[in-house]
């Protein structure tokens, strides 16, 4: 017996910086949580960015530490916060959790201070 045809879906993510990576993480978390009996679908994801995946242009790690984020350290995150309506994150920590574990890497920034963009990258 032949296998049923599986429809392929395509998705283009423009930007492989923190937002693009966060979007990919949420898609993967959703797919991991899909019911096993759900119709199998193939998903092709194309990521488009002139820079390598990771910090992107804005969050480059080689820029001056004088360039600050426009939000305090407790606000930005690369993973979904605990929220009953969301699937658990596949990422390990929020930025705030990370900076508490790695004070030397986060330049000792405190919860309500504005970290350098390079630190977030």
Language-model regions: role of each:
Residues 48-121:
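Glycine-rich active-site loop/strand segments that organize a redox cofactor
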């Amino acid at each position: 017996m032949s296998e049923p045809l599986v429809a392929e879906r395509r998705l283009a993510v423009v930007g492989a910086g923190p937002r693009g990576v966060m979007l990919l993480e949420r898609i993967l978390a959703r797919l991991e949580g899909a019911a096993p009996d759900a119709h199998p679908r193939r998903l092709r994801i194309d990521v488009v960015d002139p820079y390598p995946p990771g910090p992107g242009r804005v969050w480059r790690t080689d820029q001056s530490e004088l360039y600050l984020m426009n939000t305090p350290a407790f606000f930005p995150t690369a993973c979904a916060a605990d929220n009953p309506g969301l699937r658990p994150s596949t990422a390990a920590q929020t930025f705030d959790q990370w900076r508490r574990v790695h004070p030397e890497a986060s330049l000792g920034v405190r919860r309500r201070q504005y970290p350098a963009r390079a630190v977030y990258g």
